[in-house]
């Protein structure tokens, strides 16, 4: 055995023998490969388990927290302010309370004024109905107030270099709204605002949209009254059936988000080419003076109240087009398919009607042409029969003495034809027909169409009535009359 396989493998634990050195080298190479890549093969199984599949990727994202919504920096402040308003304002939670949106402004609410250098104040309570805050007699370039009933944007931040107006609608609190105005310091000069106001629109999903409102006020002689009239807060209770009252703030917040989305999709963006933020129908920024207030602001005609007037005409057109698109998008696919099939059926019926009319016209034309063709064929048949009869008569009178005499005389002129006609008329009309037929066949001279028609009719009658004795009489009669004409 050892003599047959002298080459022994030197690997530990392997006592195989081979007949030649080549087999041993191949075997050793296998040992080397196993020793070198054995652990790597075991690790490859673990790597395969760590393949980043979509499920594992989503799981890792959830563990890291990428799918969590980012907390808004303003959300805590707004939540605190709304909770304070809910605590301080008594709510009527009786079973007979129904959701009501008051469209009429009855009593004033609180307007807070602070120095421009002071930090942004938190919203205060709006339950003091008779409270008035005196303001310093300072010139203010812009003074605007927003009706909360028509404002559909929950968080709006309006800032400028000289004054800032913060408009806030507390979304969790459906019965409170606060208007805060900051007046500039009295020792600063009033400078007209050259550029537009930067407006920061804060959306409920945590995003901010920068927009701009043009400052069209150029004169600075704006008088601020001694006491700013206060406006009673308008309750923003959503009129949703099945919800008795504003006890749960979460549905109110979702309702506000839905209304904001509807407003953004229904209208064009809130500020385009100098338009101010609009609500559903009457959400326009008004001047601080109202007709029912004794004190008013004296502003020029280029106030911010008149800037939305010109784009108001284009709003219905955009609303109409967006309404059509929205109706088209909201249609049921089954309804779309039904309308599509109905239009197809109507088009197919119209096409079939047109094709039917066209086929009927073609059939009528074919019938007319076939009738005309039948008439022409019958006429051709009659003419052929007549030609055959004339040929038979011609062959019958080929050896007639009148024909031979006419060949001798010649009938060189048409006058001689007429004279022969006059001479032959008293004897018999048959002679006239025979003379004309013989002249036309022997000499090839064409006569008038009238004489041809007469000859044709006479020959037809002769074909019916011709007998041998009659032909002899007809031949003998002109023989005596033809001699004077020849002489």
From Swiss-Prot:
Residue numbers of Phosphothreonine PTMs: 34, 51, 53, 55, 98
Places the protein is found: Nucleus; Cytoplasm; Mitochondrion outer membrane
PROSITE patterns: BZIP, BZIP_BASIC, ZINC_FINGER_C2H2_1, ZINC_FINGER_C2H2_2
PTM-bearing positions, type N6-acetyllysine: 339, 356
Residue span of region Essential for its histone acetyltransferase activity: 278-281
Sites bearing Phosphoserine, chain numbering: 44, 72, 94, 103, 118, 310, 322, 349, 424, 428, 472, 480
Identification of the protein by name: Cyclic AMP-dependent transcription factor ATF-2
């Amino acid at each position: 055995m050892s003599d047959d396989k002298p080459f022994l493998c030197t690997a530990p634990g392997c006592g195989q023998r081979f007949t030649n050195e080549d087999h041993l080298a191949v075997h050793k190479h296998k040992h080397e490969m196993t020793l070198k890549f054995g652990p790597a093969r075991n690790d490859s199984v673990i790597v395969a388990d760590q393949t980043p599949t979509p499920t594992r990727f989503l799981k890792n994202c959830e563990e890291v927290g990428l799918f969590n919504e980012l907390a808004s920096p303003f959300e805590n402040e707004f939540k605190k302010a709304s909770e304070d308003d809910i605590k301080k304002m008594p709510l009527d939670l009786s079973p007979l309370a129904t959701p009501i949106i008051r469209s009429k402004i009855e009593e004033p609410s609180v307007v807070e004024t602070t120095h421009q250098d002071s930090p942004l104040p938190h919203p205060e309570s709006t339950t003091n109905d008779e409270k008035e805050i005196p303001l310093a007699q300072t010139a203010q370039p812009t003074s605007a107030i927003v009706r909360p009933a028509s404002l559909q944007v929950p968080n709006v931040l309006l800032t400028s270099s000289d004054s800032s107006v913060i408009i806030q609608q507390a979304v969790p609190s459906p019965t409170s709204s606060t208007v805060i105005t900051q007046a500039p310091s009295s020792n600063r000069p009033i400078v007209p605002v050259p550029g537009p106001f930067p407006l920061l629109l804060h959306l409920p999903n945590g995003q901010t949209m920068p927009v701009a409102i043009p400052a069209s006020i150029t004169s600075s002689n704006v008088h601020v009254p001694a006491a700013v009239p206060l406006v009673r807060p308008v309750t923003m209770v959503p009129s949703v059936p099945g919800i008795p009252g504003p006890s749960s703030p979460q549905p109110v917040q979702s309702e506000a988000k839905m209304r904001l989305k509807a407003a953004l999709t229904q209208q064009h963006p809130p500020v385009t080419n100098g338009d101010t933020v609009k609500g559903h129908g009457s959400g326009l920024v008004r001047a601080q003076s109202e007709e029912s207030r004794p004190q008013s602001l004296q502003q020029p005609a280029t106030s911010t109240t008149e800037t939305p007037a010109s784009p108001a005409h284009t709003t219905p057109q955009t609303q109409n087009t967006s309404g059509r698109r929205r109706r088209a998008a909201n249609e049921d696919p089954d309804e779309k398919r039904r309308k599509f099939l109905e239009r197809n059926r109507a088009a197919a019926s119209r096409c079939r009607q047109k094709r039917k009319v066209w086929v009927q016209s073609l059939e009528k034309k074919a019938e007319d042409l076939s009738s005309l063709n039948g008439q022409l064929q019958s006429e051709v048949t009659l003419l052929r029969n007549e030609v055959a009869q004339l040929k038979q008569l011609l062959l019958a009178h080929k050896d007639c003495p009148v024909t031979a005499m006419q060949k001798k005389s010649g009938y060189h002129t048409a006058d001689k034809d007429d004279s022969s006609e006059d001479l032959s008329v008293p004897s018999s009309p048959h002679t006239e027909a025979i003379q004309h037929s013989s002249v036309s066949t022997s000499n090839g001279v064409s006569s008038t169409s009238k004489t041809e028609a007469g000859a044709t009719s006479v020959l037809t009658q002769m074909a019916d009535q011709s007998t041998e004795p009659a032909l002899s009489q007809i031949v003998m009669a002109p023989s005596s009359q033809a001699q004077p004409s020849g002489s």
